Amino acid sequence: MSLNSLDLPGKPEDTRVVVAMSGGVDSSVVAGILKREGYDVVGVTLQLYDHGAAVHRAGSCCAGQDIEDARRVSESLGIPHYVLDYEARFREAVIDPFANSYVSGETPIPCVSCNQTVKFADLLQTARDLGADALATGHYIRSRANGAHRALYRPVDTDRDQSYFLFATTQEQIDYLRFPLGHLPKAQVREIAEELGLTVAKKQDSQDICFVPQGKYSDIISRLKPEAANPGDIVHIDGRTLGRHDGIVHYTVGQRRGIGVATGEALYVVHLDAANARVIVGPREALETHKVFLRDVNWLGDTPIADLPKSGMEVFAKVRSTRPPRPAVLRHADGQTWVELVDGESGIAPGQACVLYSDDSNAACVFGGGFIGRSEREPQAEEMLRRLMANADKASAA
């Protein structure tokens, strides 16, 4: 049997596709394209959080006006549309872990958790319950057949590359998901929205952290976890106490501005000592990192990660969503997985992701990745930090 444009057997009119509709232009265009091609399209929007603070805020998603926009687009396309209340699930799977991660001194990525749990687990099951052959989203990433399964690839428009946020997608989910925008530049997507007469054609793109009004994540965390706003010391990596802070929630590794001390030297946050409520700062060179240890690894490569050679596997690694993939070596031994960064990186924070690719082109295959549990700095900085932490432990035990 021949395959349709979604690589599924059968004619489009005999193929049901659930489209995850956030109310933005991207997912709306996905619904419009598939409807135009003759697919049996069903729109589903998740209400993910209390939208009171976001109803009049441009750049949110899955709340208030966005739900209404998704409904209007669905109505104009003539497709059924359902709104599912996932607020409790979103709080449990995304918001609470986000706050807990900050309290422990990490810098989390809630979008990965949302994709990993709510969107690509719970919504995927809902799509199956609706009898859909696939779940389509407006993410900028590509997938295509690779043997008996499908593999993920970076999109044509690398300025919109969302593969960093999708590294935790499992093989089973990848096989069921479809990403119709992966081969299109954003400008063309907006042109298609105009052609389709969609009311959201000129709508502003959504922000990454959708549930944080005005981007003030510290307000949300302080409300959920008041201990994150406990004051403490700002300490230089050489041991000097430089001042006080109003809560580690206001800081992240790599930060330079707004540290709150003036010493005449450029200082950066190099570590958050959550146990002792300390913000540890130092010179830029104290941020240089060549090795990161990963947890919760989702490996999509052909060779099982436990079977990697002792010499490791040459890959390209991305440690921030805004940075390109750079040369690295992936290693696994004694139950640990780590990545050696050939050229080094600065400002790597625990809780962030390290995503692995076959190369640095826009056709690169996504090998998966993991969350950064810890990193190793240059030897001198690593020793200074180790000594500082050991002294704090001794003081606490005394």
Curated annotation (Swiss-Prot):
Entry's localization field: Cytoplasm
Broad class of where this protein is predominantly found: cytoplasm
Keyword tRNA processing: yes
Residues annotated as catalytic: 114 (nucleophile), 210 (cysteine persulfide intermediate)
Gene: mnmA
Positions with a binding annotation for ATP: 20-27, 46, 138
Disulfide cysteine pairs (residue numbers): 114-210
Site (Interaction with tRNA): 139, 352
Protein name per Swiss-Prot or TrEMBL: tRNA-specific 2-thiouridylase MnmA
UniProt GO BP: tRNA wobble position uridine thiolation
